[in-house]
């Protein structure tokens, strides 16, 4: 990578290149069940983001997470000499793709694009009501500020276990509040309370065990003010949107508006899913990825 760190990149299959950009907290191997059926026609190139999987020990750059991810992806594209390739972006991976559309001319290099459950603008304001958590966005930012305050006051701690008991409780309580905010599962509050009262379970609620990386990602979502609406609307290659009909993180209405702003796009709705259709509707998710790829070979 540009800072001489080595990013882990999983490469599976043979054939035309498909670059796959994961969501926050995912590891590259999680994609394998959904891509397995297409492995004879396509080579899937799946980087692990810094802080996760095979890239968990990469140094944290000075820049924000999305800019850093785009730099890493752009470097990978150049190293592998990718051109007219298929791109799949899910959640934070889709944000990284849109960053490339706006700042790196990425759209001109694509044969097709699959955009999975992400908004083109994280903040909510008068011009865009469909950012992260919609009308609950102010509460979301308040919870992230609580997390930031705990982590900033304990920069000497590198792992969750390094925190004092009171700091651990504050961190888990704030993170649990965020999870409850986005959850439609009636069992979730009980699970959060159980974890809060059981130190052994607390760390398993956290998406990242390295606290310096957690702070980096939290500050990214607190400060990210990019607006990618115009950039993604200019994408001309065949584009498919996977949209969770019940997505609380990124309201379906906003995603539909963006899908309709493209000249060559269609939307696939996951009726029983929110932000994680690969978990709630894995069979449909796998089938629709297969259809998307098959359409590009015709």
Placement of each model-derived feature along the sequence:
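Active-site loop/oxyanion-hole signature of alpha/beta-hydrolase fold enzymes
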Residues: 36, 46-88, 92, 101-107, ...
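Conserved serine/cysteine hydrolase catalytic core
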Residues: 188-260, 269
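N-terminal cap/lid segment of alpha/beta-hydrolase-fold proteins
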Residues: 1-6
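Catalytic histidine-centered segment of alpha/beta-hydrolase-like enzymes
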Residues: 273-286
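Active-site loop signature of alpha/beta-hydrolase-fold enzymes
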Residues: 26-27, 50-55, 121, 249, ...
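Conserved HGGG/HGGXW glycine-rich cap/lid loop of the alpha/beta-hydrolase fold
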Residues: 7-59
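Structural signature of beta-strand start/N-cap positions in the alpha/beta core
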Residues: 17, 43, 84-86, 111-112, ...
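Flexible "cap/lid" loop of the alpha/beta hydrolase fold
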Residues: 109-164
